[in-house]
Amino acid sequence: MAGVITASEPSWIAPFSGLSPRQFGKLVTVLRREGADAVRKGRPWSLPLEDRALLVAAYWRTNLTMRQLAPLFGVSKSAADRIIDHLGPMLALQPRKRFAKDTVLIVDGTLVPTRDHTIAERSKNYRYSTNHQVVIDADTRLVVVVGRPLAGNRNDCKAWEESGAKAAVGKTLTIADGGYPGTGLVIPHRRERGQAGLPDWKEEHNKSHKQVRARVEHVFARMKTWKILRDCRLKGDGVHHAMLGIARMHNLALTG
């Protein structure tokens, strides 16, 4: 069965991965170095590593069903499933272990509609969703940590710790919105009970805080051009692997 899409034709790479051919080539080189193309027991892969990586990226990018996606790469539905199960986790972003003293981070939670009801719950958007705590570097806009997914009805202030994001950043200065009270994060000033308004300096601080914090919303907007984050059909850890892999490709697209 001959496929239509292949990484050997550079014009297919950007539409189906969100990366330039050069960026995609760097990703494949790192995957090969990390053992993604190692000889394994059982039936050998019917596609080269480049095409397998493009298949996974295309699945996340387009959110086509396996029945739609597999023929485009000339493989069976079950083969496409196996490729995603094997390579998806290997594409995951590795959390940054150390931060410079002057680093400023921004955290926010984003909801991913998720059909696996064993890990998802109805959230404020009335859909079954998972809550993902995403931490970015305020200066570079790169994703540095993605917490483990929690049920979509989990408050951000609880999800911050329960997802592992808090432990991952340690004591690094981190900015958040007003949904993180009592967490020790830098959040906007609030009026106290009976207070008519905030002092001018607090209003000014909140204004600059909001402008900086908007950077994480821009990251979410870019990440959600990978359509699987709008309606994830994957089960179990699949949504986590997709979030981590997309974060890695987002970073690669920014840095080249």
From Swiss-Prot:
| A biological process from GO | DNA transposition
| Keywords for the protein's UniProt record, in alphabetical order | DNA recombination, DNA-binding, Transposable element, Transposition
Q: Which domain of life is it from?
A: Bacteria
Q: Name one GO molecular function term.
A: DNA binding
Give one Pfam family: HTH_Tnp_4
Protein task: Involved in the transposition of the insertion sequence IS112 which inactivates the SalI restriction-modification system.
Protein family according to the UniProt entry: Belongs to the transposase 11 family.
This protein is called Putative transposase for insertion sequence element IS112
Provenance organism: Streptomyces albus G
